[in-house]
């Protein structure tokens, strides 16, 4: 197999040698490359650009802060941007979640959550608690610490001797279960796995349960049954286990609520936010925790943790402006409305393409799963690399999608369809039209059956 050529003028490296077009500029739901090609961003980057690209209100806020102070080290100065954004953020949180710790991105933020939880246990005289139970499959970040709570084979395998593996339970993929139970019964059965694992590990050793309320890259917008998170919360309370919600991807309004967990009427003890928090205008993440947790840690000597750029004024000015746009333009309600339309469009495609096994998600965090058989959930041949091939074909249509393996990183395929929350009806139609042409090309490549009229222009 021929290796992709490295660009002769590039000193950068990332995961592979693959070279993408160089971006020129962006606006709303579109990006342009340096050749003038216009792309519809149907994945908001990596589910980041929640308010759209190049919003003038955010640009103005960044420029204003840049003229005042771009950086002030947190041990030397407080800054208005961080204080004001923390205040504004606490106002959109559930009651009691009102203490904020800023970081620079998702991995830093989730790791900060785990360390805060650990110090809280120590402050209560429960130093035996250190185990964090998470889901399989799952993704919580790429640091060595977070690989222990992540289960996504290709990311774990090279480093498995370098980190502490934490216990896992099955993710609530109730949509695949073939039994006579109701969805609520399935949800409770999946939640019961948490209690069984706590008892197996020893309740006195279990620190926290960590989960994405709506699944991200590892499960493709997985939505648990209505009964799942209320039962999880009850189990955590019973055994003194903290519930940490990783809302790095699903939070910040993408599902139609500022926190995705709100859909279940449940509150976590600690929340991680990033990605859409500053919507790509600056690297930013934040821990939001219950006041009693933070006060206990501060009373016990302080939070033994920090980052150089924690509370960076430029990043916080961007985040504050993004939240203002989110609220002023009613983008969470728009995520619900446009998400319902997009989901209906994806479900229509599901009727036309037999290899689409499931359409799922909430708001504008949506995905569809590819299968060889909709009844048995048999996956497409892994050698097809269907998820990445569809992304390539979509690029030809000037449509940007996000894809991953569905089953632990080795098999199964899903595509994430998560445009900016500001997308309008005409842009939704364009997205679905480009996606349909992409799927037709994929079906032709692999001789897959469709229910399209044989007169369709791409089929001839």
Describe the residue ranges of each PLM region.
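Conserved N-terminal phosphate-binding loop of PLP-dependent enzymes in the Aspartate aminotransferase
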Residues: 1-460
């Amino acid at each position: 197999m021929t290796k992709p050529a490295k660009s002769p003028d590039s000193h950068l490296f990332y995961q592979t040698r693959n070279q993408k077009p160089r971006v020129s500029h962006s606006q709303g739901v579109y990006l342009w490359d340096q050749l003038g090609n216009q792309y519809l961003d149907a994945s908001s980057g990596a589910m980041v650009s929640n308010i759209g690209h190049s919003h003038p209100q955010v640009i103005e806020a960044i420029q204003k802060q840049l003229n005042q102070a771009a950086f002030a080290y947190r041990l030397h100065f407080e800054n208005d941007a961080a204080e004001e954004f923390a205040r504004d953020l606490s106002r959109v949180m559930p009651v009691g979640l009102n203490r904020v710790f800023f970081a620079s991105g998702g991995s830093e933020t989730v790791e900060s959550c785990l360390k805060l939880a650990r110090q809280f246990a120590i402050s209560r005289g429960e130093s035996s608690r250190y185990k964090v139970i998470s889901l399989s499959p799952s993704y919580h970040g790429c640091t060595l610490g977070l690989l222990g709570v992540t289960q996504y084979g290709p990311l774990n395998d090279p480093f498995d001797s370098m980190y502490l593996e934490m216990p896992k339970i099955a993710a609530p993929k109730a949509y695949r279960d073939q039994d006579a139970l109701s969805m609520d019964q399935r949800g409770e059965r999946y939640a019961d796995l948490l209690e069984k694992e706590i008892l197996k590990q020893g309740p006195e050793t279990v620190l926290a349960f960590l989960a994405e309320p709506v699944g991200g890259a590892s499960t493709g917008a997985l939505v648990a049954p209505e009964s799942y998170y209320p039962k999880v919360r009850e189990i955590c309370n019973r055994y003194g286990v903290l519930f940490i919600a990783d809302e790095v991807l699903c939070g910040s309004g993408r599902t139609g609520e500022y926190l995705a967990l709100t859909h279940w009427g449940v509150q976590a003890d600690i929340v991680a936010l990033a990605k859409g928090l500053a919507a790509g205008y600056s690297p930013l993440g934040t821990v939001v925790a219950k006041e009693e947790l933070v006060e206990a840690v501060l009373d016990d000597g302080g939070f033994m943790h920090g980052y150089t750029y924690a509370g960076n004024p430029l990043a916080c000015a961007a985040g504050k402006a993004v939240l203002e746009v989110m609220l002023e333009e009613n983008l969470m309600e728009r995520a619900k409305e446009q998400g319902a339309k997009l989901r209906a469009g994806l479900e229509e495609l599901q009727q036309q393409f037999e290899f689409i096994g499931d359409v799922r998600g909430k708001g504008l965090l949506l995905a569809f799963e590819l299968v060889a058989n909709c009844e048995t959930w048999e996956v497409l041949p892994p050698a097809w690399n269907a998820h990445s091939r569809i992304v390539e074909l979509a690029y030809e249509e000037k449509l940007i999608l996000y894809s991953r393996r569905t089953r632990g990183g080795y098999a199964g395929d899903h595509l994430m369809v998560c445009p900016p929350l500001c997308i309008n009806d005409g842009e939704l139609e364009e997205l679905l039209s480009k996606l349909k042409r992409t799927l037709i090309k994929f079906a032709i490549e692999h001789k897959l059956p469709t229910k399209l009229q044989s007169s369709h222009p791409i089929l001839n």
